[in-house]
Amino acid sequence: ETLIGILMTTVICSTLFLGITQAKLYLEAIRVKEKAFIELKNFTNEWKSMVAAGVSNFPSDSNSGEKVPLKIDSNGNTTLEGNLYKKITKATNSGQYSIYYNIQTYITWDKKNLFFNKEKSLLDTLSFNTYQIQFNIQ
């Protein structure tokens, strides 16, 4: 009886600890996604304002994109990094008097450290697809 009681207690405690660990990892994934959303929103707004101001030549992204820290440890070291990308094209319906651009932005980050994932390349992505008119400021 004692051995069965000890075994049941061990199973229940290990299940409880596994549940607590999964909950912590899930909350951390939500924090990372929230930080990625904020970075992507700021990046998109920056390019929208540049289009609105009249910038018409847009540098192409490098293969790695623009790097931003998504998770920083207590020493200030970056532990998780995201990559921001953009694709800005003149809209097909854009006319002579109303010039507007399609702005596609997205951020990717590696989520292999979350939820005990063993896969080598497991990326998560958030993306925006918006339009911005170019103001004729003279």
Feature map (PLM): residue ranges:
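N-terminal single-pass transmembrane signal-anchor helix
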Residues: E1-G19
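Flexible, low-complexity segments enriched in proline/glycine/serine and punctuated by aromatic residues
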Residues: L7, T21-Q138
